[in-house]
Amino acid sequence: MASSSFSIVVVALGVLALFAGSSSAQLSTNFYSKTCPKVFDTVKSGVQSAVSKERRMGASLLRLFFHDCFVNGCDASVLLDDTSSFTGEQTAVPNKNSIRGLNVIDNIKSQVESVCPGVVSCADIIAIAARDSVVILGGPDWDVKLGRRDSKTASLSGANNNIPPPTSSLSNLISKFQAQGLSTRDMVALSGAHTIGQARCTSFRARIYNETNIDSSFAKTRQASCPSASGSGDNNLAPLDLQTPTTFDNYYYKNLINQKGLLHSDQVLYNGGSTDSTVKTYVNNPKTFTSDFVAGMIKMGDITPLTGSEGEIRKSCGKVN
């Protein structure tokens, strides 16, 4: 009797697990193998062209994927433009005057449409472009799971609430990532995306003038192009990784150990807290960092995708069909 009850419970749990993972389970690395076999080459060509013109664009495309996935899943909602009757996510605090690369995705979408019209989603193009950006800048490669569809809606409040700001505490970072099904280790690994790219003065001003857990010479260097007065030089840029700002490597973590994290939300990863040991691991074992980063990217790409008959395949990424 006990064993049969146990069997029923096991089967029930199995069914629950099947339903819980059904969306991401419908994603596959060969989703377009028959319907659009040239999708990878087409996207890569577009990314290479954009990054060759401006290496920072690689970081911007990677960040675009993160900002998309953290708001109702990886559904290209971040690309939807505001209209007189529709408010998208682009004016949210984490995105306004900040997200970049939308025009690059639009251009790539046009190229993909010319090869196989109405087949590949904008959401999948963002995912592939993020991977290609990492590879082009010297980072790891991985097989991108595909089959996402594009949303017909967006969430301004979701963008404002779900994406952690640069002032985040460690506990806030952990909770924001946990809310998306990502572990603390995933969070530390994915924060390594800050090995490339730049940040605006307004996002690190408080750190370089008010915080004590910062290398003094580093702070002075940053202060030279980021005045203390709010409203002055707000959009002046500084590299997130002072050492190798356009190369994907583990210097981001080395900087943290030397108290040279640019953002408050960077340095909290190495400030006497629970994530210090992971930062040290990534400093001493770059291969562990890259493998964890890849695992985190795949996991992030699995966040509540629209699949099957859900959503749509947009003809133009900035608007619903």
From Swiss-Prot:
The record marks R63 as: Transition state stabilizer. Glycans are attached at N210. GO terms for molecular function: heme binding; lactoperoxidase activity; metal ion binding. Its EC number is 1.11.1.7. The modification Pyrrolidone carboxylic acid is found at Q26. Ca(2+) 1 binds at D68, V71, G73, D75, S77. One of its GO terms (cellular component) is extracellular region. Heme b binds at H194. Pfam families: peroxidase. Ca(2+) 2 binds at T195, D241, T244, D249. Removal of H(2)O(2), oxidation of toxic reductants, biosynthesis and degradation of lignin, suberization, auxin catabolism, response to environmental stresses such as wounding, pathogen attack and oxidative stress. These functions might be dependent on each isozyme/isoform in each plant tissue. This is Peroxidase 4. It comes from Vitis vinifera (Grape).
